[in-house]
Amino acid sequence: MGEWTWETGMNYNQIDEFERIRDYGLLVVYSNWSFLKNHFKENANYKKRKLGWVAYISGKRESRRLMGDYVLKEDDLRKHVFHEDGTAATTWTIDLHYPDAKNSQNFPGNEFKSIAKHIDIYPYPIPYSCLYSRNVQNLFMAGRNISVTHVALGTTRLMRTTGMMGEVIGMAAK
């Protein structure tokens, strides 16, 4: 039923409106399940099935980011700007998600399906100066909260890359 393209809250503030996003996501899941079981013409496959589990809290692609001594930007990635403090390499395209136009026709402003725009880049070393806070002493970041712009987050937010950032921060904290 669901897949990676199911995401809600693209038009809402990820921090201030989190409960609204969560509630709408649950509404989407249960409404689609009800449709498949009760109204879908070919519902024989769904009629006797049960919904086994639904995550109460969905994964956030983007939320708060802390400010480091450097903010990694799209220009850095596209122009392959050299930083002497380069660390873990990005391993993915710049992957940006937008509401799916077809879904927007039926649910304007409340889309729950997305499309991804991929911008090819070369693997890029994330500057160490993006992995620590510039104004909170001894605070490291290694994940979706690092010091990057929205577009740069599109390549740094992947699990393989965040895991490598964790290794870097673990060594730095020693």
Task: Give residue ranges: language-model regions.
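Flavin (FAD/FMN)-binding glycine-rich loop and adjacent Rossmann-like elements that form
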Residues: 1-174
